[in-house]
């Protein structure tokens, strides 16, 4: 959960920032 590729922007974002984000790894 360090960071997964975000399909929306095609760049890696930290998934562990928020408990909600860590589940999908996507930025809202």
UniProtKB/Swiss-Prot annotation:
GO molecular-function term, one example from the UniProt record: toxin activity
Residue ranges, compositional bias (Polar residues): 19-28
Annotated keywords: Secreted, Toxin
Keyword Transferase: no
One GO CC term, this protein: extracellular region
Chief subcellular location: secreted
Keyword Secreted: yes
Top-rank taxon, per record: Eukaryota
Tissue: Expressed by the venom gland.
Region annotation (Disordered) ranges: 1-28
Localisation: Secreted
Function: Causes symptoms of mild intoxication and transient paralysis in insects (A.domestica).
Protein name as catalogued: Venom protein
Protein's organism: Rhopalurus junceus (Caribbean blue scorpion)
């Amino acid at each position: 959960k360090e960071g997964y590729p975000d399909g929306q922007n095609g760049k890696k974002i930290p998934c562990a920032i928020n408990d909600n984000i860590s589940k999908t790894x996507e930025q809202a």
